Amino acid sequence: MSAQIIAIDAMGGDFGPRSIVQASIACLSATPSLHLTLVGQPSLLEDLVSGLAAADRARLQIVAASEVIGMDERPSQALRGKPDSSMRIALELVRDGKAQACVSAGNTGALMALSRFVLKTLPGIDRPAMVAAIPTQAGYCQLLDLGANVDCSAENLYQFAVMGSVAAQALGVHRPRVALLNIGTEDIKGNQQVKLAASLLQNARGLNYVGFVEGDGLYRGEADVVVCDGFVGNILLKSSEGLATMIGARIEQLFKGGVLSRAAGAVAMPLLKRLQADLAPARHNGASFLGLQGIVIKSHGSAGVQGFQSAIQRALIEIQENLPQRLHGRLEDLLL
C-alpha cells in the first residue's frame, strides 16, 4: 500500500498538543503506511515524541510554526494577521503536495476561512460544507452542514446534497438516499429555502432524493445523507452528542443502586458498554470539509486521544478513496 501523508495542526484545540501527539503516535503504530507531519512549536513537540520507537519516528516529521490561532479569534484576524500559524502551515503543506490531508482541532471559523483561501473550492461549489457520520438504527448517515454555513440558499443546500451523496458512495453506500431535514415530511412544511431546495433535488439527475426527513426519522435510518443549514446541523450534532453522553451516565447510575440493581448491571453491563462505546462522540469525531481542492478534517476542540484518532482515521479513509477527485469527477454531471 502506498504511503498516506497527513499534516497535523498540533497546536490547535482546547488542551494543547499533548493529546494530539498521543493520538498521532497511536495512529502511526497502528498504520504502517501512515506518515505524519506535526506542525507547531518544535521544542515542545520533540519532547512529546521523544519516546517514540525508531521505526515510527522515521515516519513522523516536525515542521516549525511560530504562531497559534486562538479558539476565540476572528477568522479575519487569523487570515490576515497570522501567516505563520500552525493551522495555516498545515494547510499549505496540502496545497503544495507535501501532505494529502490536514487534521485540526482548532478554531472552526478560522479553519474554514483559511481552507478556502489556501486550498480553494472545487469548480462549481460556492461554499464548502462540514459533514460527519451520525449513528442511526440502520448504521450511519452523513449529516451536513454542521456549522460552516449558518445561512444557506436553496442552491447551497442542493450543492451540499450532491457532495454528501458522493461522499456516502465513497464510504461504501450504494445509491445513497438523500433527504432534507425538515419539521415535517409533507410538501407544505418548511421554510422557503428548504422548499426551493426540495424542488431542485426532485429534478436532479443521478441523485436518489427521498424527500423530507424529520429528526426522529434521521435516527431511524430513513436516509443515508441528511442535508440542512449549518445552524440547524450544529445544534442537532451537539444535542445528539450530549444525549449520548447523558444516556451512558444515567445507565451507569441506575446499576449502582441496591443489590438487585448491581446484580442486573453485572449481567447487562457488557452489552450496555458496547452500546455506549458505539454511541460515544469520540468514536464519530472528525468532520470533513467537503467541496475543497484538498482534504481537511475538523476535530472537536475538546477531543481527547480517542477522539483525535477518529479524526485521523477519517482523513485516512478520504485519502484512500481519493475523495476530492471523486467529487470533482461527479460535480459536472450533478450541479445545476
Swiss-Prot record:
Main location: cytoplasm
Keyword Transferase attributed: yes
Keyword annotations: Cytoplasm, Lipid biosynthesis, Lipid metabolism, Phospholipid biosynthesis, Phospholipid metabolism, Transferase
Domain of life: Bacteria
EC number: 2.3.1.274
Record pathway: Lipid metabolism; phospholipid metabolism
Signal sequence segment: none
Intracellular or extracellular location(s): Cytoplasm
GO terms under cellular component: cytoplasm
GO biological-process terms attached to the record: fatty acid biosynthetic process; phospholipid biosynthetic process
Molecular function GO labels: phosphate:acyl-[acyl carrier protein] acyltransferase activity
Catalytic reaction annotation: a fatty acyl-[ACP] + phosphate = an acyl phosphate + holo-[ACP]
One Pfam assignment: FA_synthesis
Function: Catalyzes the reversible formation of acyl-phosphate (acyl-PO(4)) from acyl-[acyl-carrier-protein] (acyl-ACP). This enzyme utilizes acyl-ACP as fatty acyl donor, but not acyl-CoA.
Family listed: Belongs to the PlsX family.
Subunit-structure text: Homodimer. Probably interacts with PlsY.
Designated name of the protein: Phosphate acyltransferase
Species of provenance: Pseudomonas putida (strain GB-1)
This protein's encoding gene: plsX
